[in-house]
């Protein structure tokens, strides 16, 4: 018995050291519950390492997924430390649009398991409503990405489980070691609903829906997977779609936030707004609206100077900064700040999400992508060449007249159709998607794909926007609305043709 106990203690200690060496984890869309897209700590990946030439292409893997319209693979979520039946493993979980989930051993660049979900054939698939698996998550803490995880035991107890919403609307809880359903799938959304940004704040699973696909109302959905009844709760916008690509956002004050796009605009609807919801009941707590101008990104949430702040991007080319305590004031229309537009082609600001981070000095930054030239009314102190097709722009959160405001800081080099950026240890990773973007609803997915170009990944200095590295011609297809994810010294890109690319700093074995 003493020998067994000693072995168990040794394994636990080894797992803890293994986890601490590898850094934090990307567990959900945009990395964490606040959707910051920021990995705070990484043991290997840093600005200095990139400048020294250590960052490079590592591997690529073609998955046997069949794209549905423009949907293909989901943003990878990571489990950097699990004690599996094959020993210590570092896994990436990726959903395929054709209702398949893949687990990749990213140290060895091998498929660990494949799970094919039992769903009905999709009928009447369209570009707007593809009838696809579009989101995968793990259990996510309310804090931010970048602290070392505990030892992963797998199975039910440690809740390293993988949560997936299939195209038929059922929520699956998959064993991270095998891909098997741990429990009976739960009826969550209507079949063929367009789910975005699934996130599990244990034991409640949340997701947003858009475009009224499958008859699912635009809004936010939740189900308590820990309760026997598995009752589903819903909040409906009664107007515009939920904006952006990151889904529901948990503020640092504990409330749930979503932004909404264009739709019926009246006192009984929540179009063109940022809305605060109670996370337990999904009842509306407060809202802000700038008027008849729709939001185009999911919000981000962060704490600054003792305030719980929210930011979101709008089709008018502006960022809106909100204080969760006042949230637009008594008229619901007064933000903390809305600087001059930075997107000159209004409506092209459609990357879907933002990113935020704090530098070592404590300065808070907000990053956004624009799909066209930068607006002349915004003067960025640091520029990195002429912008024609799009770029990443950066703002600092500074104090002015006793309150926080946004101060333009830098604009990156020109990029073709950038998706939302991510941040790791002072490095901004920006992906020029290469996707042909159009407002022509009659244009098919195949026609759009034909006019798209290969994506390019860029590494930028987070302080200046200066280019440190790029992937050149390594990537051979475009990316549809999926930002990279990162962790454990690596950055992952998924392309429309079903290929996963890994870039990073090689792990010494």
Label the predicted regions:
Residues 2-12:
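Bacterial N-terminal signal peptides
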Residues 21-47:
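Predominantly extracellular/luminal regions of secreted and cell-surface proteins
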Residues 15-19:
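Sec/Tat signal peptide C-region and signal peptidase I cleavage site
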Residues 13-14, 480:
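Mature, folded catalytic cores of secreted/periplasmic enzymes
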Residues 22, 43-70, 80-90, 99-132, ...:
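Extracytoplasmic/lumenal domain signature
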């Amino acid at each position: 018995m003493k020998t067994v106990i000693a072995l168990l203690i040794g394994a636990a200690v080894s797992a803890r050291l293994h986890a601490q060496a590898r850094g934090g984890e990307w567990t959900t869309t945009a990395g964490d519950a606040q959707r910051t897209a920021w990995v705070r700590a990484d043991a290997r990946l840093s600005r200095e390492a990139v400048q020294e030439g250590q960052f490079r292409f590592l591997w690529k893997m073609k998955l046997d997924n069949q794209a549905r319209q423009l949907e293909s693979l989901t943003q990878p979520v990571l489990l950097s430390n699990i004690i599996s039946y094959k020993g210590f493993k570092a896994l990436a979980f990726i959903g395929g649009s054709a209702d398949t989930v893949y687990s990749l051993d990213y140290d060895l660049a091998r498929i660990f398991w494949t799970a094919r979900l039992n769903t009905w054939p999709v009928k009447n698939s369209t570009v707007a409503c593809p009838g696809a698996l579009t989101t995968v998550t793990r259990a996510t803490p309310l804090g931010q990405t970048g602290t070392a995880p505990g030892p992963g035991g797998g199975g039910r107890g440690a809740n390293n489980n993988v949560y997936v919403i299939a195209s038929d609307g059922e929520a699956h809880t998959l064993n991270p070691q095998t891909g098997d359903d741990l429990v009976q799938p739960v009826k969550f959304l209507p079949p063929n609903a367009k789910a975005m940004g699934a996130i599990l704040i244990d034991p409640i699973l949340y997701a947003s829906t858009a475009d009224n696909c499958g008859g699912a109302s635009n809004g936010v959905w939740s189900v308590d997977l820990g309760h026997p009844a598995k009752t589903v709760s819903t909040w409906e916008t009664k107007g515009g779609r939920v904006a952006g690509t990151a889904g529901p956002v948990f503020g640092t004050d504990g409330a749930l936030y979503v932004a909404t796009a264009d739709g019926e605009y009246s006192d009984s609807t929540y179009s063109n707004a940022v809305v605060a919801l109670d996370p337990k009941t999904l009842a509306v707590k407060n809202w802000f609206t700038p008027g008849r101008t729709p939001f185009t990104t999911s919000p981000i949430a962060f704490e600054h100077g003792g305030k719980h702040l929210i930011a979101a991007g709008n089709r008018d080319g502006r960022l809106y900064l909100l204080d969760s305590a006042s949230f637009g004031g008594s008229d619901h229309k007064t933000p903390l700040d809305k600087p001059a537009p930075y997107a000159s082609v209004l409506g092209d600001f459609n990357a879907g999400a933002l990113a935020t981070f704090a530098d070592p000095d404590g300065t808070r930054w907000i990053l956004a992508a624009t799909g066209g030239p930068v607006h002349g009314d915004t003067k960025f102190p640091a520029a990195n060449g002429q912008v024609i097709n799009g770029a990443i722009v950066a703002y600092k959160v500074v104090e002015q007249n006793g309150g926080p405001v946004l101060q333009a800081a830098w604009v990156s080099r020109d990029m073709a159709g950038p998706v939302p950026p991510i941040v790791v240890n002072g490095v901004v990773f920006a992906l020029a998607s290469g996707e042909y973007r159009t407002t022509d609803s009659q244009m098919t997915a195949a026609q759009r794909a034909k006019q798209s170009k290969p994506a390019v990944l860029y590494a930028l200095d987070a302080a200046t926007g200066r280019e440190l590295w790029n992937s050149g011609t390594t990537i051979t297809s475009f990316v549809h609305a999926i930002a990279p994810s990162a962790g454990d010294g690596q950055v992952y890109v998924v392309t429309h043709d079903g290929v996963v690319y890994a870039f990073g700093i090689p792990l010494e074995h």
